[in-house]
Design a protein with these regions (language model features):
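Ferredoxin-reductase
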Residues: 1-72
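Gly/Ser/Thr-enriched, mixed-charge loops and adjacent short helices
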Residues: 65-106
Length: 106
């Protein structure tokens, strides 16, 4: 999974927690660094990943931040994002040991 973030102050801490959770669930992470959301989307087509998460508050004030999630090359929405919410709320996480690597895409 590619992980990118914008330059909001909370981005680094959210990235650290996200990467920890993903790798402890057996997911391999490619950290593409501080990039705008369109570059995270670009990475889904040009980096060997099965999805991506951009940490961004988008157009919201700087004190807000969140995740834009993708499966394959498309955005996670509708029933898919509701299923993710259910997994998180129930704590139904897989256990594993994923790896992390950094890849500069710009």
């Amino acid at each position: 999974v590619a992980v990118g973030r914008d330059n909001r102050p909370s981005g680094a801490a959210l990235r650290d927690a996200l990467v920890k959770g993903l790798t402890e669930s057996g997911v391999d992470v490619v950290d593409v660094g501080v990039v705008p959301t369109p570059l995270l989307y670009w990475s889904l087509h040009h980096v060997n990943v099965v999805g991506g998460i951009q940490i961004t508050g988008s157009h919201n004030p700087p004190e807000y931040n969140g995740f834009k999630c993708c499966v394959g090359t498309g955005s996670l929405h509708g029933e898919g994002i509701q299923r993710l919410r259910q997994i998180i709320e129930a704590g139904q996480f897989r256990s594993g040991s994923g790896n992390t690597r950094e890849e500069a895409i710009i």
